[in-house]
Amino acid sequence: MTKVVVCALYKFVSLPHFESIRAPLLAMMEQAEVKGTLLLASEGINGTVAGNQEAIEALLAWLNNQNGLDNIVYKLSFDDEMPFYRTKVKLKNEIVTMGVEGIDPLKVVGTYVKPKDWNALISDPDVILVDTRNDYEVQIGTFKNAINPVTETFREFPEYVKQNLDPVKHKKVAMFCTGGIRCEKSTAYLKEQGFEEVYHLEGGILKYLEEVKQEESLWEGECFVFDNRVAVNHELKKGQYDQCNACRMPITEAEKRSPAYVQGVSCPHCVDKISDEQRKRFVERERQVNLAKARNEAHIGSDVNQVIEARREKKEALRKLAAQKNKLKQTGTV
């Protein structure tokens, strides 16, 4: 069986005319049968895609020929099945959303640490090690002795820093994330807040797992990934977790044996949180998925990323509305 190549990539670079890249990039991906999602913004490009080796090589070559997108940071892993259903190129305000204006990794960023040097750094008792990922990611794996900020989204990270880290008290701070992109912004943010010695794992967890031998590794557990593999082990192969299509939380085989678990409808993490309307919708979606499987067809609507994106768009709309209300209150017009 031909292996599917999964490529996680990003680059912070000034792209003032990023909108014009979308159409030719999407056309190239569709022609090469590359699936997945790439985000474009004025600050760069980010995303994870998959295809056969020839297709991924063609995409990387195409990007390398675009002004500013050469020498892109990417990491490869492999799977037996295609982890994405669709091909998308989206235009965004940020390629990774922190929600703080003026944070620019092109101007200031932390010190990059190679995977081979990471163990020595985080073994230093004077170093504070912070996992910048979301809580559901941390729960299935992290580095030994890492602090979990218990955030639901990356937008919450600045508040965590404000409440828990002090540039006077915490002289050395090391941070890490899945592929490195969130650390670009988190270290830039800490530098802006006056922290002097700020470090981050170059290439992220995925690069560390690729380059550091398991017997020498300080990584514990599996690494959550944002595709249908859910998580990868130290060999960068699909791990032991599945994902609840209702709430996107990773779930174990033991949790799937719980009475709260209904495939495609609920799990122990969300059974008490979803509404009756949502439950009905999830039941119908699962019925459609099973019908599609019986006909040996792909049911696009079963893609959990579609649910995630809808939630993100709803949250963003609510944030904008709240910001508008606050602005009106400050100006005394309400």
UniProtKB/Swiss-Prot annotation:
CDD domains: RHOD_YceA (cd01518). It catalyses: uridine(34) in tRNA + AH2 + O2 = 5-hydroxyuridine(34) in tRNA + A + H2O. Its EC number is 1.14.-.-. GO terms for molecular function: oxidoreductase activity, acting on paired donors, with incorporation or reduction of molecular oxygen. SMART domains: RHOD (SM00450). The keyword Chaperone does not apply. Residues 123-217 form the Rhodanese domain. Catalyzes oxygen-dependent 5-hydroxyuridine (ho5U) modification at position 34 in tRNAs. This is tRNA uridine(34) hydroxylase. It comes from Shewanella sp. (strain W3-18-1).
